């Protein structure tokens, strides 16, 4: 899977989790950029991403990711 394909899939996941079809994530996207992205939604998002990509994040990754680009890096390493 390419980086671009990961972003396409992540866009769908983010749109579903946050119920907002206008969301388009990029490397620099953070929780501050998405209105409803709080700590509870972060957990829901991580579970949805894990399910979409058939992988699991470590607790350190769940709490340590600073932006979507870092999330993509982890996903690509696990593919």
Per-range role (PLM):
Residues 2-37, 41-47, 51-79:
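Phosphopantetheine-dependent thiolation modules in NRPS/PKS and related acyl-activating systems
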């Amino acid at each position: 899977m390419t980086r671009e394909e990961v972003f396409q899939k992540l866009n769908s996941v983010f749109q579903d989790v946050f119920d907002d079809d206008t969301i388009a994530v990029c490397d620099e996207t953070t929780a501050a950029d998405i209105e409803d992205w709080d700590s509870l939604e972060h957990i829901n998002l991580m579970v949805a991403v894990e399910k979409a990509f058939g992988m699991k994040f470590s607790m350190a990754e769940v709490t340590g990711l600073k932006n979507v680009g870092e999330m993509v890096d982890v996903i690509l390493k696990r593919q």
